[in-house]
Amino acid sequence: MSAVTSDYTPQRVVCLQPSATVILAALGRLDRVVACTKYCADVCPEVKSGGRSIIADSWTAQSRQILAARPDLVIAAVPYQEKAVVEILKAGVRFLGLAPKTLADIYCDIATIAGAVGASQRGQTVIANMQQEIEKVRKRVKGRRRLRVYCEEWGKPLIASQRWVAELVEAAGGEFLGDPGAQSSAESILAMDPEVVVAAWCGAGDRVPLEKIVRDRKWQPMSAIREGRVYCISDELLNTPAPTLVRGLQALAAAIHPGSFPQPERLRCISDTRVRTDAHRSD
């Protein structure tokens, strides 16, 4: 859904979608953002400065709160509150809705936002850089055995990561298990016997309780658990469809091929906790 015209360059943007904020930062157009949600600020801390309005979240925000920022463009994920969209459009404000499912969709979103804010050339550069970084990783893992990888974006219920994450897992040299974005059960995941488990829960950062989920789900017989290959990746690196996915890919590559890629800061392995616990007990 879009009401953006090609002959207009917005100067006051309200971001209700974190990925849009990250994309605008990559485009060098963060100065156009006059208001955003707290989740946008979480993934893009730079937006907290400059006196910008912080809206609680996109689903509880009222149109009057959004319009109070005097935007000429509102960017949100769709489907969105139908009533709010109608009121925004009635006020003469342009609305851009994002609903990416694949990496190709994300590239299109970057190009669309770049075009809307007068940064088309920069947008193409951002896209090209993403594609080049993904291809670098793909080439490094070419010919290696693909490990079975289970990635989830939520734990109760168990929901597999989105399709773009499945594409990143493949690029990192893994075999994505299950259906992207689908709900599953602990028993069905155990039956697939993943060799690597990655948890990136929405809104949890890198604080997923890995030991607890293994214990509660009775996954001890799983290959990934026996080998200590259970990881948490900060959710913004995988769940935010923006240029930062490249860092998520690097974390996935380190989880799948730890001997070939350095472990980034926002990748945590269940064995890391065990090492700290053992060291504490020996003191």
Which role does the model predict for each range below?
Residues 1-283:
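N-terminal ligand-binding lobe of clamshell/alpha-beta domains
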